[in-house]
């Protein structure tokens, strides 16, 4: 076959394959064009999730008839300065979107330039048969896309259901709307309004806050910390959820570079690392985080879809984002999710409140007690400890922990108003500490709370290299199931040494342990080493020190803590509460579960119909 030059329409259809994957891709490109045009109002109308019809209307700068004619040609744009290709401030700059969309659909563009008397429209079918004519239109541009992919029917077979395609489009509009709270957006599907967002004219932070409430929800703002970092060539701002307010997927994570929505692995990993000490591995935080960076320090021209970026100094960006998130979380590190308490309130709502008043029956002291049925607890992330953790529970010393908690704070009773978590009043089922503040009661899970306290303490010991080793009087020989586990432990002996464990190879399948961390006291060395060997075997040979530290610290803290079922004195309960108030991230244990919930007095009064 001889080499030949492809036709312009064929080239455009090939380009469309990279840029336009589904109706959501069309909406993204056209809405971004509307934003670049300086619009203050953008309306989107869809039929059959955009498969039949997509209409994008804006009140932007508009186009003349001459501009309309060349706008649908490849690589024509008003947004790129050829002398400064790296200094890109707009969404679009490649000049590919309109001709690519036109090549696979029936397109009609109507536009009127600002301050011009006349409007014009251009009609294209499959990118050909261009027809320009006068029209009647307000200032701005309206683009109609009909029968998407009619020119490439094979692509239609790969589209999902209308519901799935619509969800993708809604997600695209939400992301762009979050980045531009000053613009009004509406999205209508088959005659039904799905989104109606009013443009804000307040200060920048309040604009963003209100738009986040409209898009993600007010609950998110109530359970989020504000991020605020500034430097000469870099800034990070936005909101990120506290650890106990999380989701089972990452769908509600919105990340932006210079107001451009991105799915960047570097940023996603940084977000994960920032939360790794405070959230289960199968849960995800919610966030709307904006990074503003000098355009010359980031490359957005990696792919035509422009969802991926490259940083000039990726490690700098990664570390800066991690530190910014951690600093923001530390401002609310003692707070547990407000939705947990709300869920609890809903469970106990009296069905007769606000209806006919129910008459309480007098108590019959001679009647037999009815069977006790515990109330269903609110849903929280489920944590299943590993077998080795449970096996080690009974082997660990509690004397050191008890001695620490039993330190007397004051001889006189503590006042509820003195402390954020209040004064301890009772212990429920030898598991939960009940305390009272001025306007609420607080229920604390004693094991989860002390587990977080222990985790932070051990983590600081390791970070500051203050973990003291205790030499065993008689070295412990641990026999492992196979030679592989013994080899992996020995290969990581230097890393384990930094965690307070000194060991050597002793035969093919055995390890001899000579030193352990002093903080653990009389621990069952056999079970600890077997647990570590199993973990290293799962992770492979090249486990990072940070990952090893995380696993070992969690294991230490799990057994370090006060167990459920242990009776505490009033002073012990108050000591635990005071330590929580002075320990970062005490609102959740290191598995992401809440350590306490707070029930406001006004909510309790509502339960009894008082308010």
Swiss-Prot record:
Record-linked InterPro entries: DNA_mismatch_repair_CS, DNA_mismatch_repair_MutL, DNA_mismatch_S5_2-like, HATPase_C_sf, MutL/Mlh/PMS, MutL/Mlh/Pms-like, MutL_C, MutL_C_dimsub
One Pfam match: HATPase_c_3
Keyword DNA damage found: yes
Superkingdom field: Bacteria
Family annotation (CDD domains): HATPase_MutL-MLH-PMS-like (cd16926), MutL_Trans (cd00782)
Disulfide cysteine pairs (residue numbers): none
UniProt KW keywords: DNA damage, DNA repair
A GO-annotated cellular component: mismatch repair complex
GO BP field: mismatch repair
Any GO molecular function: ATP binding
Transmembrane segments: none
Coiled coil regions, renumbered to chain: none
NCBIfam families membership: mutl, PRK00095.2-2, PRK00095.2-4
Protein family: Belongs to the DNA mismatch repair MutL/HexB family.
Function: This protein is involved in the repair of mismatches in DNA. It is required for dam-dependent methyl-directed DNA mismatch repair. May act as a 'molecular matchmaker', a protein that promotes the formation of a stable complex between two or more DNA-binding proteins in an ATP-dependent manner without itself being part of a final effector complex.
The protein, known as: DNA mismatch repair protein MutL
Lineage: Bacteria, Pseudomonadati, Pseudomonadota, Alphaproteobacteria, Rickettsiales
């Amino acid at each position: 076959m001889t080499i030949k030059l492809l036709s312009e329409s064929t080239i455009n259809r090939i380009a469309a394959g990279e840029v336009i994957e589904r109706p959501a891709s069309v909406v993204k490109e056209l809405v971004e064009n509307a934003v670049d045009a300086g619009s203050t109002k953008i309306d989107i109308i869809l039929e059959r999730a955009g498969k039949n019809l997509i209409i994008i209307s804006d009140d932007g700068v508009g186009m003349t008839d001459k501009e309309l004619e060349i706008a649908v040609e490849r690589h024509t744009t008003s947004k790129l300065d050829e002398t400064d290709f790296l200094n890109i401030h707009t969404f679009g700059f490649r000049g590919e979107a309109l001709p690519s969309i036109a090549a696979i659909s029936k397109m009609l563009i109507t536009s009127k330039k600002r301050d011009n008397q006349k409007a014009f429209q251009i009609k294209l079918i499959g990118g050909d048969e261009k027809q320009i004519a006068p029209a009647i239109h307000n200032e701005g541009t309206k683009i109609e896309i009909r029968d998407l992919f009619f020119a490439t029917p094979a692509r239609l077979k790969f589209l999902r259901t209308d519901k799935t395609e619509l969800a993708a489009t809604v997600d695209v509009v939400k992301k762009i709307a979050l980045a531009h709270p000053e613009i009004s957006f509406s999205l209508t599907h088959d005659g039904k309004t799905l989104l109606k967002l009013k443009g804000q004219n307040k200060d920048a932070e309040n604009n963003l806050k209100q738009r986040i409430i409209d898009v993600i929800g007010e609950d998110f703002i109530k359970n989020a910390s504000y991020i605020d970092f500034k430097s000469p060539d870099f800034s990070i701002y936005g909101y990120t959820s506290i650890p106990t307010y999380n989701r089972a997927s990452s769908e509600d994570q919105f990340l932006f570079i210079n107001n451009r929505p991105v799915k960047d692995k570097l940023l996603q990993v940084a977000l994960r690392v920032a939360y790794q000490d405070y959230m289960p591995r199968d849960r995800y935080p919610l966030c709307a985080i904006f990074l503003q960076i000098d355009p010359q320090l980031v490359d957005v021209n990696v792919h035509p879809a422009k969802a991926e970026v490259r940083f000039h100094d990726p490690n700098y960006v990664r570390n800066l984002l991690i530190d910014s998130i951690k600093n923001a979380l530390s401002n609310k590190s003692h707070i547990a999710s407000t939705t947990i308490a709300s869920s609890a309130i809903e469970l106990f709502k009296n069905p007769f409140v606000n209806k006919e008043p129910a008459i309480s029956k007098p108590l019959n002291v001679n009647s037999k007690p009815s069977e006790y049925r515990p109330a269903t607890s609110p849903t929280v992330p489920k944590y299943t400890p590993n077998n080795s953790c449970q096996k080690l529970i009974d082997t660990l010393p509690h004397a050191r922990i008890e001695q620490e908690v039993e330190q007397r704070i004051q001889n006189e009773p503590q006042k509820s108003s003195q402390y954020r978590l209040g004064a301890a009043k009772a212990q429920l089922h030898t598991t939960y500490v009940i305390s009272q503040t001025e306007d609420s009661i607080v229920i604390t899970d004693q094991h989860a709370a002390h587990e977080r306290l222990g985790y932070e303490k051990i983590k600081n010991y390791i970070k500051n290299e203050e973990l003291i080793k205790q030499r065993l009087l008689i070295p412990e020989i641990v026999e492992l199931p196979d030679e592989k586990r013994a080899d992996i432990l020995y290969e990581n002996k230097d890393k384990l040494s930094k965690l307070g464990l000194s060991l050597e190879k002793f035969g093919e399948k055995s390890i001899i342990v000579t030193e352990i961390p002093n903080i653990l006291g009389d621990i069952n060395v056999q079970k600890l080493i077997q647990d570590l060997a199993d973990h290293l075997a799962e992770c492979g040979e090249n486990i990072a020190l940070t990952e090893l530290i995380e696993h070992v610290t969690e294991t230490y803290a799990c057994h370090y803590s006060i167990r459920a079922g242990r009776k505490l004195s009033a002073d012990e309960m108050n000591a635990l509460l005071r330590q929580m108030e002075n320990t970062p991230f005490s609102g959740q244990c290191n598995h992401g579960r809440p350590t306490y919930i707070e029930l406001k007095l006004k909510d309790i009064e509502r339960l009894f119909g008082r308010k």
